[in-house]
Amino acid sequence: MKNAFFVTASIACGKSTFIEIANSLGFKSISADKIAHKILDENALELEKIFSPFNLKNLLTKEKKIDRKILGEIVFNNKEAKKTLENFTHPKIRAKILEQMQILDKENKAFFVEIPLFFESGAYENLGKVIVIYTPKELSLKRIMQRDKLSLEAAKVRLDSQIDIEEKLKKADFIIKNTNSYVDFRQECVKVIQEISKGKM
C-alpha cells in the first residue's frame, strides 16, 4: 500500500510516542497493541480455556478481562505458551490491521502502522515502507525496568524475545534515534514525517 508506513522497534524505544507525535501533526495511525488488547478482552473466556493446561491462576480480572501482566509473565518465560497465544491472536490482529489499512489507504495520505513485531511476524512485509526507532539495548533495558517495574533479568527476557535492534536497522527505510531527550526525539520524528509527507499530501 503506497501510503502505509510501518513503525517498529524493540521494547520501550518510543513507538507509541512517535504515533502520538504523528497524530498531533494530523496523520492517522493504527496500533497493533491496541487491536491486540481489544482482541484479548473480547476473547477472554476462550483464552482462559486455551491456557488452562498452563495452570495460570487469576488470568481474568474481576471484570472478566485478561490480566495482561499475568499473561505476559507466562508468555515471556514459556515458549509453548507464547506460541499458543500467537497462534490464536496473530491471525485476528493481522486481519483487523489489513482491514483498517485498506480504509486509510484510500484517503491518499500517509498513515502510520505501529507494529512491535513487524519483522518477527513476517506478515506485513512488502505492504509499505518501514520506520525503525533506535535505542541502544542498555537504554531499552533501563526503560523497560522503569516502565514495567521489572527486574533486570525479566527485562532481558522480554528484550531478547525479539529480533536484535541492530538487525532491524539493516532492514529499515527510515531510522529515528531515540537516545537523548524528548525534545531531540520529537525533532527527529517531525523531520522524518515531513520527509514522508512531501509526496503524500
From Swiss-Prot:
Keyword Repressor, does the record have it?
no
Per UniProt, where does ATP bind? 12-17
Q: Name one GO molecular function term.
A: dephospho-CoA kinase activity
What family classification does the UniProt entry report for this protein?
Belongs to the CoaE family.
Predominant location category: cytoplasm
| Organism per entry | Campylobacter jejuni (strain RM1221)
| Annotated DPCK domain residues | 4-201
Going by the entry's taxonomy, the superkingdom of the source organism is recorded as Bacteria
GO CC annotation: cytoplasm
One of the GO biological process terms: coenzyme A biosynthetic process
Q: Keywords in alphabetical order, please.
A: ATP-binding, Coenzyme A biosynthesis, Cytoplasm, Kinase, Nucleotide-binding, Transferase
Q: Can you state which reaction this protein catalyses?
A: 3'-dephospho-CoA + ATP = ADP + CoA + H(+)
Looking up Pfam families in the UniProt record yields: CoaE
Put simply, this protein is called Dephospho-CoA kinase
Reported function: Catalyzes the phosphorylation of the 3'-hydroxyl group of dephosphocoenzyme A to form coenzyme A.
Q: In which pathway does it act?
A: Cofactor biosynthesis; coenzyme A biosynthesis; CoA from (R)-pantothenate: step 5/5
Q: Where in the cell is it found?
A: Cytoplasm
What EC numbers are recorded for this enzyme? 2.7.1.24
Q: Which gene encodes it?
A: coaE
